[in-house]
Regions:
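Short, well-ordered secondary-structure micro-motifs
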Residues: 81, 101-104, 171-172, 194-195
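Conserved beta-strand elements of the Class I
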Residues: 88-92
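Short, acidic/small-residue loops that bind anionic groups at enzyme active sites
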Residues: 59-83, 174-192
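N-terminal glycine-rich anion-binding loop in soluble enzyme alpha/beta folds
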Residues: 1-26, 93-134
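Metallocofactor- and cofactor-centric catalytic cores in central/energy metabolism, strongly enriched
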Residues: 2-45, 49, 59-62, 193
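A short, acidic, amphipathic alpha-helical segment used as a generic capping/interface helix at domain edges
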Residues: 138-155
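Gly/Ser/Thr-rich loops at beta-strand to alpha-helix junctions
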Residues: 45-57, 69-75, 94-98, 162-168
């Protein structure tokens, strides 16, 4: 079996990650340093936990020899090939106001519909204020409502969860909406399954 190693970056904050700016300087240096440490420990895959970290993909990947996945948004070119009609793909993100083209690692986002959690959702409040107490039932309901809105208003046929904090609600959203829901966990599983003998 495989095991996971979780490392919290000393310099990272929610405000640093969920930003319209490209990450550089000491935080980017720390990401590379931690990735190299994980590689030295024998990790065969390195990921982040924030979908806004796409802009660091090429820099971190250039510094390690193992696969590096910065964001679930790396799924976009594949899904745009499979779901080819405009508005087929929706993205549920932590904050749609901060999500910019550079977060998509250079991939075309034309025809993709973005919906955010920002404003009055429970998950947004808890993450942005770094609280620990979460009303799970309310969060699940609001995540499902946001995806339902993407379906009702735009006719999306699949959704990418940008934020890994959305992953616990994936099965509920799939059951409630009957559409395909993708996240970072799917990218990790894709890699894991490819290594199985």
């Amino acid at each position: 079996g495989s095991q996971s190693i979780v490392v919290k970056l000393d310099l990272a904050t929610v405000a640093d990650a969920i930003s319209t700016e490209v990450i550089d300087g000491p935080l980017l240096d720390e990401m590379v340093e931690v990735a190299l440490q994980l590689e030295a420990k024998g990790c065969d895959l390195i990921t982040t936990s924030c979908g806004f970290l796409g802009p660091v993909q090429s820099h971190v990947q250039a510094n390690v020899t193992v696969p590096f996945i910065s964001t679930s948004l790396l799924l976009l070119p594949f899904l745009k090939t499979v779901y080819s009609a405009p508005n087929d793909i929706g993205i549920l993100t932590f904050d749609s106001r901060a999500l910019r083209p550079h977060h998509f690692v250079g991939h075309d986002i034309g025809g993709v519909v973005v919906q955010g959690l920002e404003s009055d959702t429970e998950l947004y409040r808890v993450i942005s204020t770094d609280e620990r107490a979460l009303d799970e039932e309310r969060a699940a309901r609001e995540v499902t409502e946001r995806v339902t809105k993407l379906i009702d208003e735009f006719g999306v046929r699949c959704v990418i969860f940008e934020c890994t904090n959305l992953s616990p609600y994936k099965s509920q959203v799939r059951s409630a909406t009957e559409i395909a829901v993708f996240d970072l966990v799917d990218l990790v599983a894709f890699h894991r399954n490819a290594l199985k003998g």
